[in-house]
Amino acid sequence: MEEKQKSLSPPPCPSTVTVRRNPPRRARATPFTTTTKPPLSSLACAKPHDVPTFPIDEILSIQIPQSEPKPAIAESLKIFLRIKPLRTFTKVTTTTKSRPRNVWPQNPSKKNNAKENRNPEITKKVRKKDEEACITLNDSYSVTLTPPQSLQELKRSKTEVYEGFSHVFPADCSQNDVYDKMVQPLLEDFMKGKSGMLAALGPSGSGKTHTVFGSLKDPGIVPITLRQIFKKNDESCSGSLRSFNLSIFEICSERGKGEKAYDLLGGESSELSVQQSTIRGLKEVPIQNLEEAESLIGQAMLKRATATTNSNSQSSRSQCIINIRASCNGFSNETKLQSSDAMLTIVDLAGAEREKRTGNQAIDFGLPGTDPYFILFLMPTIPLTMNTRYLLAVTVGVPEEPKEGIAETSSKFFGSLTRYLRDYLEGKKRMALILTVKAGEEDYLDTSYLLRQASPYMKIKFDNTEEPCNKRQLKTFPRAEKNKKIKLSAPKTSQIEENFQGERCQISQEVNLQGKKADPTDRSSPRLEHVAQDKNEREHIIMRNFSKVLWNVLKQCNEKLKVAEGEIFTLKDSLRREQLKSLGLETELISLKSSCLAQPCIPEVEVIVNAKEHFEVDAALTNERNVDDDSCNLIKARREAGAEESSETPVPKVVRNVDDDSCNLIKARREAGAEESSESPVLSVLRNVDDDSCNLIEARREAGSEESSKSPVPNVRNVDVDSCNLINPRREASTEESSESPVLSKNVKDAELVPCHLSSENDAEPRQSVNSEENVGIPSTITHVEAEVTDFQRDQNQDDPTPSPEQVEVSQDCINSGLSNVQTKSAISRRFPDSEKQERNRRLLPASSRSLTEEMNDLEIKDIQTEKQQVKTTNTRVQKKAVSIQGQETEVPPREAEPASTKKQKNGQKPKRRLQPASSVLLTREINTLEIEDDIAEPKVNRGGKKTTVSQPRSQGSVTLLRLLTNNLHL
């Protein structure tokens, strides 16, 4: 077995080993192409291959040369001392009295005493001797403190020498000297990315604030530091890659209370909360130039808490901290690394001194030796590093554990400032102190106390360790940010090419940074890239603001468009309404024009006129009398002329047509039945008359055409009588009408009936009993002709059966006028239906005329009924009435003078008369033109008293025409 193991042992490893990173090897076969596995017996029989082992021991035994670590640089705490120059006191005196010119010489000694006694106000200019300095400068690193003579006599103090200062500034030094020695090293480290702090402490009036801030003529540390920062930033190549921010706040410690922090660059109530080395709510203002920084510092100084003490008129009562933060936005070619944000802190502490001497009420801790220079006791109260603690315990003699009183005082009243300055007090960051003292004899105690407390800390040393950079060394490529910023606009090809080229440049830059050496001359690419990035960001901001403005403008336009659309809609609606109104007005205008064309003459009706207008009535009646006289004379002349003229006068064929229509209507009424005759006895009388007239018409037709051609005039002889007389026979029934109509009797008082023009035909509905087409069924043509001869036929037909030529001519005129009215009415009925005509008539007729027309219709109906009652009496009365009509002219007195029953005057004298037009004929024309439908015809009584068997009602016109034809048959 041992032999087998020896044979299987690998050969010895050579002295040199070559390791290939990627050795060539063949690809393995896929499992589908592999052959069947050989049996285990064959594997056992096969000899194993000789595989050498990996030489781990040799590799581990190789010694790699390591770089020697740099020894830590032990630096001592830098403490500077500045001595304030002494002050000289001068008193200027003025004399109120001048010496007179002419005086006797006096003793000089007596003269001086007399002046002092007499004039105590008079003083003289006395220069006080220079104050003796209690501190003297030995060299740049040590001073000697000498007590004044008063203290030396009492043997309370001795001369002391203090050494170990980083530098001592004499009284005649300038602000630039202080900056060069103390601030310049801190500023250089700050520009390289290292943080640092500078604190100024000392008694009130020693020059702390003057050293830190200075004045306009002699600026202090802070203004000079800012000036140098911007100057170096402009000179350096990486200046554009660094930005600066400024923040100023104060921490106030009040008596018996804790601490409060306030932001001096914020608003009025800008209280802060201190959390370790960070302050929540602190405002950082970016600064671009020196002017902005100086204006911010001046604004903060005005808000700082100050108070008046015995040693200074404006003593700082708070701890003022000024922070200047530098942030790097790119790569620094000097350091070849991206450094973290650096902070330069300058602290102006409050004035600290003995309370009894200065009257300072701001700080009083009750513990001796802890109130003025608390910062010197902060280091023992916080956990320091091992090195710092060891140095404090061995070299200085500071106990490792601080005293209880000091720890309580520091933690209670300086907790905020202690936590904020923790990194500097532990030695992690660089810190420098400047002590300001006064060299006067009066300030010996404060100066001695300050130097004794600061002397142990001059020997403290700490390791200057580099802070590790927490940020990444390489800047990531901002592709996602660019995509986010270019959301509003579509990417262009030029932009895509620029981005690709920028990526390539940055990748090559990263490769160069990873190498050992980089080209120091190549400084343009990061700067150009940063400039391009700033330009893109600026363009993005401009486009975003422009898009916001454009969106607001579009919103305003949209609102205005909505308002305009609403106004357009209202205007369209109003326009539509106006169009409808205009259409209605046009329709009404057309109807008015058609009515005016269809009715050339305005009908006349009788209306009730007030008694005040009697003079107009008299004038109308006078004209009517003249017309009646002329017409009567004309008729008499024609009667004397003979029958020859009557044969020559042409008569239209309308009478024959009227006879035919009336005969047909009478036959139709007979077939209607006997129901109406039983209901109204008056209609039965009319039917009897129609029967007789129908028989007479048939007999007349048999006579032939010779009769009509030779003498057509006798058929209408009796038509002229009423139109010749033009006297209303219904005057006889005026008394009965006034008694029957109470409404009319009220309106008839002090009034007369006169002709009047009306423009409406719709209000004649009360006259339905006189002329009705709907109930009777007679056409308008027959009704119109018959109505003209209705009233006059009752009286004239009995007296004079034989017509005269004058009567025939007058009747011819009446028939022609009736035919013209019939044609006008038929034209109107074709154009307008009955419903439209009635609606138009109602609209055109005024309310007053309607009421008057109704009253007149009632009056006329009652007149007709009165006449019919008079016809029923006797034939004798009818004959007398006919004689009176032919021989005499009827007098028409006023309505008020009419008796209850009118009678004809039998005397031979011709009374005064008032003639009126044939009102019945005029009213009939108006009613026929307007197609007013009447009720059932008024009851009539036959002369012989016989009742007809015809049950169908007849109109007044047809009865009158039949009576006319009957009277003319026997001629």
From Swiss-Prot:
Pfam families per record: Kinesin
Region (Disordered): 1-44, 93-121, 700-856, 872-917
Tagged with keyword Nucleotide-binding: yes
Biased composition (Low complexity): 29-39
Species of the source: Arabidopsis thaliana
Tree of life domain: Eukaryota
GO biological process, one term: microtubule-based movement
An MF annotation (GO) of this entry: microtubule motor activity
Binding sites annotated in the UniProt record for ATP: 202-209
InterPro entries in alphabetical order: Kinesin-like_fam, Kinesin_motor_CS, Kinesin_motor_dom, Kinesin_motor_dom_sf, P-loop_NTPase
Record carries keyword Zinc: no
Family, per entry: Belongs to the TRAFAC class myosin-kinesin ATPase superfamily. Kinesin family. KIN-6 subfamily.
Stated name of the protein: Kinesin-like protein KIN-6
